[in-house]
């Protein structure tokens, strides 16, 4: 029997959607779930170290959120335009979402920051997506840092005092339109402790696209088409993960983006881990056969989202909905700035 969208719905009291990050990253709460027994324990994120064994590997996504939202003016008409950068296709060409899209025809020019940066629409695609080419003097990322703002998820209504709180402490590779949020709980000190305990820290890159927030519209979830995202796992990382595996250690993923990268590679190479890069549209849902990941850290996800489906593929649907109900009863904080789960 195929599952429907309603099977992944749950009632979340509005006040449990975290609007701001907690003061200390690793003081967020942690719901530990044993997927074999269904047993749950309420902890704090800094307790995660007790769950990790020497010889395990913790995998993290080092993608950095770009200040991808730009506000500009069309010199021809004086009309305003909002441009959200999705990803860099080549050179100075970008795939973007534009508002208002219907007025952004091919050839339209938009100026940002008094002309420090201009863009020309080069192609129109479906879903309001526009290809644009930028023109500027200097270094693009520096100009973007000065003119752009970080796009926060639509359910966060409050302004962020410190934009760094929507970046992981190890964010390095520019390219995401949203943060890989499970990683927001790690601090440099906690990662050092993890390393000191004999656990390997492994970094990969997956640039999170806006499809992350796109609702599933098909009742039959098998009909849902995932968005594509760019990923990369380098040679050193693959080598470390293979050594950990050979020595009986666990591969513990931080967040759904790390999971999707590792499972994409495992699916491509018959369960093996090899260095690889490319685009993935993997849709992990109940019935999926896991290839690489042994345990993972993840936040609490939106009702009916593909991310809830991914977690349900690991635990079973009933178990995850029960865990979410427990989290609601215990007043855990949900979504991007919320608390975390450790599922093993």
UniProtKB/Swiss-Prot annotation:
Keywords: Cytoplasm, Queuosine biosynthesis, S-adenosyl-L-methionine, Transferase
Cysteine pairs bridged by disulfides in the record: none
Compartments where located: Cytoplasm
Pathway where it operates: tRNA modification; tRNA-queuosine biosynthesis
InterPro entries: QueA, QueA_dom1, QueA_dom2, QueA_sf
GO molecular function: S-adenosylmethionine:tRNA ribosyltransferase-isomerase activity
EC number annotated for this UniProt entry: 2.4.99.17
One GO BP: queuosine biosynthetic process
Highest taxon of the lineage: Bacteria
SUPFAM superfamilies in UniProt: QueA-like
Reactions this protein catalyses: 7-aminomethyl-7-carbaguanosine(34) in tRNA + S-adenosyl-L-methionine = epoxyqueuosine(34) in tRNA + adenine + L-methionine + 2 H(+)
Enzyme class label: transferase
Keyword ATP-binding: no
Coiled coil: none
Cellular component terms (Gene Ontology): cytoplasm
HAMAP family for this protein: QueA
NCBIfam families: PRK00147.1, queA
Family listed: Belongs to the QueA family.
Subunit comment: Monomer.
Role noted for this protein: Transfers and isomerizes the ribose moiety from AdoMet to the 7-aminomethyl group of 7-deazaguanine (preQ1-tRNA) to give epoxyqueuosine (oQ-tRNA).
Name of the protein in question: S-adenosylmethionine:tRNA ribosyltransferase-isomerase
Species this protein is from: Lactiplantibacillus plantarum (strain ATCC BAA-793 / NCIMB 8826 / WCFS1)
Origin organism lineage: Bacteria, Bacillati, Bacillota, Bacilli, Lactobacillales
Gene this protein is translated from: queA
């Amino acid at each position: 029997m195929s599952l429907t969208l309603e099977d992944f719905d749950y009632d979340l009291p509005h006040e449990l959607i975290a609007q701001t990050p907690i003061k200390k990253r690793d003081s967020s709460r942690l719901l530990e779930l044993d997927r074999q027994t269904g047993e749950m324990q309420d902890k704090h994120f800094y307790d995660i170290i007790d769950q990790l064994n020497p010889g395990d590997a913790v995998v993290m996504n080092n993608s950095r959120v770009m200040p991808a939202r730009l506000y500009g003016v069309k010199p021809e008409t004086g009309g305003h335009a909002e441009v959200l950068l999705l990803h860099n296709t080549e050179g100075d060409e970008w795939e973007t979402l534009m508002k208002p899209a219907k007025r952004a025809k091919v050839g339209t020019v938009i100026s940002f920051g008094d002309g420090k940066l201009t863009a020309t629409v080069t192609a129109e695609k479906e879903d309001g997506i526009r290809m644009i080419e930028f023109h500027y003097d200097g270094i693009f990322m520096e100009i973007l840092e000065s003119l752009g703002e970080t796009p926060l998820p639509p359910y966060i209504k409050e302004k962020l005092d410190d934009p760094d709180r929507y970046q992981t402490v190890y964010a390095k590779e520019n390219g995401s339109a949203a943060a890989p949020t499970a990683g927001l709980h790690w601090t440099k000190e906690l990662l050092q402790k993890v390393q000191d305990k004999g656990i390997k820290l492994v970094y990969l890159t997956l640039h999170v696209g806006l499809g992350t927030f796109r609702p599933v519209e098909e009742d039959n979830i098998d009909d849902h088409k995932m968005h594509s995202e760019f990923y990369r796992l380098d040679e050193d990382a693959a080598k470390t993960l293979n050594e950990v595996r050979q020595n009986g250690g666990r591969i513990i993923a931080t967040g759904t983006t790390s999971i999707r990268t590792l499972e994409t590679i495992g699916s491509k190479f018959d369960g093996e881990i090899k260095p690889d890069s490319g685009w993935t549209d993997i849709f992990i849902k109940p019935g999926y056969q896991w290839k690489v990941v042994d345990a993972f850290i993840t936040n609490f996800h939106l009702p009916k989202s593909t991310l809830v489906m991914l977690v349900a593929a690991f635990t079973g649907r009933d178990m995850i909905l029960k865990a979410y109900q427990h989290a609601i009863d215990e007043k855990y904080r949900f979504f991007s700035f919320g608390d975390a789960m450790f599922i093993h």
